[in-house]
Design a protein with these regions (language model features):
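Catalytic core of membrane glycerolipid acyltransferases/transacylases, capturing the structured
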Residues: 419, 433-490, 496, 553
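C-terminal ends and interior cores of transmembrane alpha-helices
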Residues: 70-94, 301-315
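Transmembrane alpha-helix termini and helix-breaking/packing motifs in multi-pass membrane transporters
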Residues: 15-26, 80-90, 147-180, 249, ...
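Juxtamembrane intracellular "pre-TM" segments in multi-pass secondary transporters
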Residues: 196-232
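Substrate-agnostic recognition of the 12-TM MFS/MFS-like secondary transporter fold
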Residues: 1-16, 37-75, 100-159, 228, ...
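A cross-family acyltransferase "interaction/gating" segment
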Residues: 427, 503, 507, 518-557
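Cytoplasmic membrane-interface "Motif A"-like loop-to-helix N-cap segments
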Residues: 58-74, 285-302, 382
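Hydrophobic alpha-helical transmembrane segments
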Residues: 95-105, 109, 134-200, 270, ...
Length: 557
């Protein structure tokens, strides 16, 4: 349902952009309609953010999705009527048709703004936390694919099957929008298939809700991690909005006229589509068991490198490859942040949090529209715009690397480990998604910590002798995995440290044998883990590793 909604909105947008350019070229419309449409698309998200968040918390989210689907169909009918007026009065530029069509487009943006918190918030209600990263990867991939396909198909339809077969400007826009009504009907059917959900129980509507933008933002800002996630997501949408307008500018410069502009824009967008789809699916696969925030750094680095190189390779086959890399990086950047924000938001305020995040996203979108328009009007070459955009991405990536060094290194280390060793885990879903958990595992090799970390859906903290921290490489790995230093002469302190970590909601692993196995079987089990579990009041889950005995990391030889 989200896919069809996104496709419909962007299909219409990229029908209206060349329509406006064509009308402006014959004096029946002002220039720069693409910037007006860009603003109209994001302004409802800004002004309606508190109301949309309240709506998603006050009523069952599946009902909000259903109502918005009917509203979208009604608006598409209104837009078709406006375009029909334009066809009927083509000789005088369409008369009142253009203002009516632009108003209908604005209503489509209103519909998307009211729908967004409900469609994002319903994911956790239907799937829970454990599959949130995976679901967000699929959702973001299909949604962005729909956005870009809508833009590509809309532009090609207007150009190839409209103008180039002899139809007038209005007729070239009217026919495809008429067909898109089918997508509106499909959205309604899909919305009725969503399972019923419960309302979060928000307060009754009050006038002050309409203008409480900064109150909702304060909810997000009260949690530093949640606020940084919202800013990161906003940066992605600002980056995407600027890049989109920059590619439209390049298409206009290459063609120099309306003819062929839609196709050229579609050609430039195609590698971005493929990159985002691949990146979203990759993020979904990597985050299948747990949300990997280290991907955010990887995505940011890919975005910055690709965008900087586009400044020097803005034409030819290599430029399309770089656009694909930028798209892939953008998906890897956004998917974990979206999943983290949804998971961290309190259930009773999830709609408000997502709505406040949308407010940030669209303020970034407004800034992107204004900034790119200023760059174009000032005559700034495209290559300099790419360079500035890439430099900004590089700065953000380095900042994220400072914030998330452990997540990034952990992702890289475990990624390399998984590529060398094939690991099959059974029963990992028995580990609770939150709260303290004590894992009790057998100890076969020096790499047991990596095996368990690669298998568990949650980060694990291991008990490790303090002397090990003094070794350069072992100490690095211990800090990377937030190991708890203990002393062999102060056993009581070790029990207290482990218990405190468990009370704080961590997953702690102990090897109760106290040493590596010398035979491949179990050694004597020490009782310290029982004292830890009793003191922390947490569940104990046994973990057994097999197939490692005989490796170079064991005492088999």
């Amino acid at each position: 349902m989200q896919t069809t909604n996104a496709f419909n909105d962007n299909f219409v947008k990229f029908i209206l952009i060349p329509l406006g350019v064509g009308l402006a070229s014959i004096g029946f419309a002002p220039e720069g309609l693409e910037y007006l449409l860009g603003l109209l698309l994001v302004l409802p998200f800004v002004f309606l953010a508190p109301s949309a968040g309240w709506l998603a918390d006050r009523f069952p989210k599946n009902l909000i999705i259903r109502w918005s689907s009917w509203f979208q169909l009604a608006v598409l009918v209104l837009m078709s009527f406006g375009l029909w007026i334009g066809v009927s009065s083509e000789g005088n530029g369409g008369g009142v048709a253009l203002p009516l069509v632009i108003f209908a487009f604005f209503l489509l943006a209103v519909q998307s703004a009211l729908l967004s918190p409900a469609k994002m918030g319903v994911v956790k209600e239907l799937l829970g936390s454990s599959r949130l990263g995976f679901a967000n990867g699929l959702m973001e991939g299909t949604a962005i694919l729909a956005i870009l396909l809508g833009q590509i198909i809309g532009g090609i339809w207007f150009d190839k099957w409209g103008l180039q077969v002899g139809r007038g400007i209005w007729q070239a826009a009217f026919t495809p929008v008429l067909w898109i009504l089918i997508g509106g009907v499909l959205s309604i059917f899909l919305s009725h298939a969503i399972e019923p959900t419960k309302a979060a129980g928000a307060e009754p509507f009050k006038k002050k809700i309409v203008m409480r933008h900064f109150v909702d933002l304060r909810i997000v800002r009260s949690d530093v991690a949640m606020w940084r996630s919202a800013l990161g997501i906003a940066f992605f949408w600002g980056f995407g909005g600027f890049l989109q307008l920059l590619l439209i500018q390049i298409a206009q410069e290459r063609k120099g006229s309306l003819a062929g502009m839609g196709v050229e824009t579609a050609i430039l967008w195609m590698p971005v589509v493929l990159g985002i789809v691949f990146g979203s699916l990759l993020a979904s696969w990597i985050c299948g068991r747990r949300n990997e925030l280290g991907l955010v750094v990887v995505g940011g680095l890919l975005m910055s490198v690709a965008t900087v190189l586009l400044a020097f390779l803005s034409s030819g086959i290599s430029s399309y490859g770089l656009l694909a890399i930028a798209g892939c990086g953008g998906a890897l950047f956004m998917v974990p942040l979206n999943a983290y924000l949804q998971d961290r938001a309190p259930e009773s305020e999830r709609g408000l949090v997502i709505s406040a995040s949308n407010l940030c996203n669209n303020l970034a979108g407004v800034f992107a529209v204004v900034a790119q328009m200023a760059c174009k009007k000032s005559g700034m070459p495209a290559w300099i715009q790419f360079l500035v955009l890439g430099g900004l991405c590089a700065w953000v990536s380095l900042y994220l690397l400072r914030l998330l060094p452990k997540d990034f290194l952990r992702l890289v280390v475990l990624g390399v480990f998984r590529s060398i060793y094939r690991i099959r885990s059974v029963g990992h879903r028995e580990i609770p998604s939150e709260g303290g958990v004590l894992l009790v595992a057998n100890h076969l090799t020096y790499i047991d910590a990596f095996v368990l970390s690669a298998s568990c859906p949650r980060p694990i903290r291991f008990l490790m002798f303090a002397d090990c921290f003094e070794n350069k490489w072992v100490g690095f790995g211990a800090r990377l995995f937030d190991a708890l230093p203990i002393s062999s002469t102060r056993a009581r302190d070790a029990i207290v440290s482990a218990s405190e970590a468990l009370k704080q909601g961590a997953v702690v692993c102990v090897f109760p044998e106290g040493q590596l196995s010398r035979t491949g079987g179990l050694s004597e089990i020490k009782r310290g883990y029982q004292m830890i579990a009793k003191k922390a009041g947490c569940p104990v889950i046994p973990a057994y590793m097999d197939g490692l005995w005989g490796s170079i990391w064991s005492f088999s030889e």
